[in-house]
C-alpha cells in the first residue's frame, strides 16, 4: 500500500511539472523583457518579448531567433540558407514577401518554385506551409493571413472551447471568439491559448483545477 501511494505521488508530481512546463512554454518570455532569454527551437522573439512566428514576431523589432531582417544568406553569405524555410532574397537577406520570395530569390519557398491552391489544381504546400491567395507557399501574414487557401492559415481556423479545445498552429493566439490570429484582438483580453499576454496565470489555474479533480 505504501509503495502504491509513493508511486501515485511521483506520478502526480510529474504531472504537475509537465503542466507547469507546458504553461511556461505557451507564455514564453524572451529578450529584454525576459532576462535576455532566447526562444526555443529558434522561434522569433518579438519587440514585446514574446516567442512565436510570423510578422509580429520575426519582423520589425525582432530581438533574437529567426528574425527576418538579421539573417544573411545565399551567395553573399557563402551559400548559407535561411532558417524555418524563409526566402533568401537576391540581396542575401532572409524574410518573406515579394522582395524576398520574388524575382532573384536564391532559396527557400521562392514564388517561382512552389505553387499551390486553385491556381495549381488544388495542390497543397509541403510541411503544412500556407498557400496564399495568389497560389504560392510560405509563412507569415502574406501567406497565412487573408485569403489563405490551405495549410497553417492564421485567420480562419476555429479554436478554443467551442472547437473541442483545439489550439492554433505556430503559437498563434486563440481569441475569446474562437479564431486564430495575432494582435490585441486575438492575444489580449479573453485569449484562450497560444501566445496570450496573460496566458501563464490562466494555464496554471486550469491545470491545477484539472489535477485536483
Curated annotation (Swiss-Prot):
One of its GO terms (molecular function) is chitin binding. Residues 199-213 form a propeptide. Disulfide bonds join 30-45, 39-51, 44-58, 62-67, 73-88, 82-94, 87-101, 105-110, 116-131, 125-137, 130-144, 148-153, 159-174, 168-180, 173-187, 191-196. InterPro entries: Chitin-bd_1, Chitin-binding_1_CS, Endochitinase-like_sf. Keywords: Chitin-binding, Disulfide bond, Lectin, Pyrrolidone carboxylic acid, Repeat, Signal. The keyword Signal applies. The keyword Signal applies. Homodimer, u-shaped. The modification Pyrrolidone carboxylic acid is found at residue 28. N-acetyl-D-glucosamine / N-acetyl-D-neuraminic acid binding lectin. It comes from Triticum aestivum (Wheat). Substrate binds at residues 37-39, 89-100, 141-142. This is Agglutinin isolectin 2. Residues 28-69, 70-112, 113-155, 156-198 form the Chitin-binding type-1 domain. The 4 sites proposed for binding to carbohydrates (N-acetyl-D-glucosamine) of receptor molecules are on the surface of the agglutinin molecule. Residues 1-27 form the signal peptide.
Amino acid at each position: 500500500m505504501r509503495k502504491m501511494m509513493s508511486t501515485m505521488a511521483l506520478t502526480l508530481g510529474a504531472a504537475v511539472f509537465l503542466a507547469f512546463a507546458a504553461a511556461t512554454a505557451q507564455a514564453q518570455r524572451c529578450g529584454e523583457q525576459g532576462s535576455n532569454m532566447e526562444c526555443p527551437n529558434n522561434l522569433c522573439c518579438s519587440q514585446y518579448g514574446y516567442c512565436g512566428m510570423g510578422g509580429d514576431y520575426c519582423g520589425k523589432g525582432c530581438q533574437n531567433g529567426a528574425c527576418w531582417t538579421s539573417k544573411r544568406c545565399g551567395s553573399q553569405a557563402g551559400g548559407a540558407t535561411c532558417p524555418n524555410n524563409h526566402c533568401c532574397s537576391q540581396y542575401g537577406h532572409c524574410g518573406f514577401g515579394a522582395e524576398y520570395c520574388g524575382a532573384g530569390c536564391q532559396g527557400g519557398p521562392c514564388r517561382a518554385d512552389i505553387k499551390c491552391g486553385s491556381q495549381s489544381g488544388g495542390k497543397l504546400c509541403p510541411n503544412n506551409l500556407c498557400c496564399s491567395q495568389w497560389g504560392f507557399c510560405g509563412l507569415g501574414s502574406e501567406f497565412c493571413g487573408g485569403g489563405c487557401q490551405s495549410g497553417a492559415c492564421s485567420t480562419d481556423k476555429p479554436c478554443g472551447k467551442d472547437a473541442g479545445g483545439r489550439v492554433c498552429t505556430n503559437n498563434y493566439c486563440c481569441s475569446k471568439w474562437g479564431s486564430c490570429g495575432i494582435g490585441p484582438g486575438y492575444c489580449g483580453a479573453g485569449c484562450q491559448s497560444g501566445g496570450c499576454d496573460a496566458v501563464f496565470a490562466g494555464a496554471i489555474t486550469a491545470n491545477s483545477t484539472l489535477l485536483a479533480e
